[in-house]
Amino acid sequence: MTEEKKENQKIVNLIIISDSVGDTAFNMVQAGAVQYPNVKFNYRRYPFITNREKLEKVFSEITEFENVLIAFTLIHEDEQLAVIKFAREHNMKYVDLLSGVIDNIHALTGEEPKHEIGAVHHMGQNYFDRISAMEFAVMYDDGKDPKGFLEADVVLLGVSRTSKTPLSLFLANKNLKVANLPLVPQTHIPDEIYKINPKKIIGLTNDPSVLNEIRRQRMIAYGLNPDTTYSNMDSINAELEAADKLYKKLGCYVINVAHRSIEETAALILEHLGIDDYAK
């Protein structure tokens, strides 16, 4: 990233407060954050905040922060109200990730919630598998560590702007361990890619015109000239041709993501893998 882009990049401080481990809140916030690739997010997690004293310590740490969104999962109402009061007094945004669901279920059923901290962790191994898959997707996003390719259930390949990261997180929510690799011109393909069962590899592609428009809009969002090598049609066609050549060499399944939602692309991947339990 150029210095100019760094200076213009918007930054949001995401504060995650929970009276349990905070994984639920973190995953929900992260699922929203990935929709903003041009924004830098600074995450701060505060788990096991089970009383007012601990909450006040959190407040003292974050009071000087700017551009803050506080996301919280707190069972007890007095802690919830304390967070809301603090956020309003310090001009911070906030979102209560739990109360809306609990209150609406109560309204529909008349049943009283048990107000048990960390109750979600009694959901069984399926819950922990999902959390593990989400952590795996984050750890091995953008080819950060090639060893992840050998451990993954699915490996996504694709040029820039083919939805690799949001797809990884969506599939992780299906308990699949997903790693992805951006295909960058003149960049070495890790040896591990050639050692993977081709059925586990998904090659993502896009229509050149769609990719051109997406990349141009991204450059405009950065306040930069949209007519660059990155968005040039000749460069895009060369990237897509190189990717197609690699996909043929690997013998992997290829999906054109143009005009497809993340859910539609994920459904094709699950079908290819022979997974039809969409509630997994």
UniProtKB/Swiss-Prot annotation:
Residues forming coiled coils: none
InterPro entries according to UniProt: Kinase-pyrophosphorylase, P-loop_NTPase, PPDK_reg
Enzyme Commission number, as recorded: 2.7.11.32, 2.7.4.27
Principal EC category: transferase
Molecular function per GO: ADP binding; ATP binding; phosphotransferase activity, phosphate group as acceptor; protein serine/threonine kinase activity
Reaction(s) catalysed (UniProt annotation): N(tele)-phospho-L-histidyl/L-threonyl-[pyruvate, phosphate dikinase] + ADP = N(tele)-phospho-L-histidyl/O-phospho-L-threonyl-[pyruvate, phosphate dikinase] + AMP + H(+); N(tele)-phospho-L-histidyl/O-phospho-L-threonyl-[pyruvate, phosphate dikinase] + phosphate + H(+) = N(tele)-phospho-L-histidyl/L-threonyl-[pyruvate, phosphate dikinase] + diphosphate
Classification via Pfam families: Kinase-PPPase
Cited function: Bifunctional serine/threonine kinase and phosphorylase involved in the regulation of the pyruvate, phosphate dikinase (PPDK) by catalyzing its phosphorylation/dephosphorylation.
UniProt family annotation: Belongs to the pyruvate, phosphate/water dikinase regulatory protein family. PDRP subfamily.
HAMAP family assigned to the protein according to its UniProt record, in alphabetical order: PDRP (MF_00921)
Listed name of the protein: Putative pyruvate, phosphate dikinase regulatory protein
